[in-house]
Amino acid sequence: MKPVIETHALCKSYHGRPVVDHLNLTVPEGCVYGFLGPNGAGKSTTMKMLLGLVHPTGGSVELLGHTLNEANRIALLRQTGSLIESPSGYLHLTARENLSIVADLKDVDRKDISRVLEIVHLTKDADRKVGQYSLGMKQRLGIAIALLGSPKLLILDEPTNGLDPAGIQEMRSLIASMPQTTGATVLISSHLLGEIEQMVDQVGILSHGKLLFEGSLQQLQKHSRGDILLRVLDAPKAAAVLQQQGVKAAAPADQPDTLQLPPLPDEALAALVCTLAESGVGVVGLTAQTKSLEDIFLSLTQTSGEVA
């Protein structure tokens, strides 16, 4: 099965400065893909190139199995819904009236309006003027507009931006259910992994226009192991044995019976414990610290892809 989105060495430069740098992105069908990176990483520019709103300096984009070009752009975009930057809409009109205008422009049957209103939980507020909506309601209306016509792909640029905690939770639930409720694959951008990790299956991490990581959340977790805390009966003796084995151990000032070791493979760690026991060092406990996904994300983006 072909991916819904593929980019091949995609580049965009402004005045000679690369904003997107040889990006190879792969978004599988039927997933919610989190496109992550700090502000200014190139996420919005990439999304605009996926929609044909910005012309690449180099490389190519494939949407729904077809290379995006001027000849097929409109046909492909009819199968794509998007919410880029702030949600658009006429504030003096109701949500239903806004949706009617877009449905006519898209040549979509107006009967589809009730369906998308129900998906985003705006049915009860459909006849209120959009100017009376909260930011979260406006964001949901933007997604309803994107869903008109049952697109196969949804591209959402930071839809949780500016929302309060309740609004973020509501948006998480809505987007996480999209592949099941609408059949659409979702590409969602954010600069905060913590905001979207509960709704995505796959992640791509962008920094300075380069893709640092792409894979599942589980793969991202495995991408970095935390330090190991070793509790022993004789810390100085244990440190000396470890040094003989080429392992540098630190002694936390507030834990005199504990040594802090760098991340080690399971086999190496098991061998070290055996060596310590054979040397007469009593090993009391062993704790492998786990970095949070947010810590891994920050490490990647702050160190050009090398996890600190």
Predicted regions and their residues:
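Phosphate/oxyanion-binding loops and surfaces in catalytic or ligand/nucleic-acid-binding neighborhoods
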Residues: L105, T303-S304
